[in-house]
């Protein structure tokens, strides 16, 4: 089950893009934040919001919970580094659930507080997971995704509140994890099969 939880993470990307396209108002993936998709629209002429905000908030909750559950095998390992990475994934996933439970239009301060750990823990989780727990091409790919996520998190902090490119920066911070997690899960599954002498 934990591995399946991570294998399904790219579904988050599909859900987010689909909801952006079906927002019912003018919404820009480049300029509007992800949280805006969880924000209800005051009128048909509103921008940077969604007519189906409940759906995006549900996506935050479901995929955040799956992300945390997928980290359970790491928490059970003896190596301290594996447990550190595991807890980073748990923190990022748990607070992602909080983002969905506290939409920015209903609870702006709480939303900001629960979103902040995601932008710290998740990029670090990708980068450290790749550097500490993988080798070869998987390590190279994960490191590239981790660096991109860190750059995105810093850029988003700088651009927060700007009229342009904040959505791009936020997605650069968040999306790499959704690409990395299935790769990490497959790597762990292969290692486990080898440990049991399976092909």
Predicted stretch roles:
Residues 1-25:
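N-terminal signal-anchor transmembrane alpha helix
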Residues 7-8, 60-80:
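Transmembrane alpha-helical segments in integral membrane proteins
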Residues 21-35:
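Interfacial/capping segments of alpha-helical transmembrane domains
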Residues 39-65:
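Interfacial helix-start motif at the membrane-water boundary
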Residues 52-62, 109-124, 169-172, 176:
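Membrane-interface loop-to-helix entry segments
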Residues 59-69, 120-129, 176-190:
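Hydrophobic cores of alpha-helical transmembrane segments in multi-pass inner/ER membrane proteins
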Residues 89-130:
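Membrane-proximal helix-loop-helix units in multi-pass membrane proteins
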Residues 130-199:
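Terminal transmembrane helical module of multi-pass membrane proteins
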């Amino acid at each position: 089950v934990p591995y399946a939880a991570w294998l399904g993470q790219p579904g988050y990307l599909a859900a987010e893009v689909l909801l952006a396209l079906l927002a019912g108002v003018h919404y820009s993936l480049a300029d509007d934040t992800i949280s805006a998709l969880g924000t209800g629209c005051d009128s048909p002429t509103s921008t940077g919001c969604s007519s189906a905000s409940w759906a995006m908030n549900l996506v935050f909750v479901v995929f955040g919970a799956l992300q945390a559950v997928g980290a359970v095998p790491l928490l059970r390992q003896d190596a301290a580094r594996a447990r550190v990475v595991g807890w980073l994934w748990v923190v990022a996933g748990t607070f992602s659930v909080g983002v969905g439970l506290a939409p920015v239009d209903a609870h702006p301060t709480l939303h900001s507080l629960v979103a902040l750990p995601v932008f710290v823990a998740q990029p670090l989780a990708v980068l450290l997971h790749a550097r500490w727990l993988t080798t070869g091409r998987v390590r190279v790919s994960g490191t590239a995704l981790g660096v991109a996520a860190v750059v995105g998190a810093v850029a988003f902090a700088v651009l927060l509140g700007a009229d342009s490119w904040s959505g791009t920066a936020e997605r650069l911070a968040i999306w790499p994890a959704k690409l990395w997690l299935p790769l990490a899960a497959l790597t762990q599954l292969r290692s486990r099969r080898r440990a049991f002498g399976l092909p």
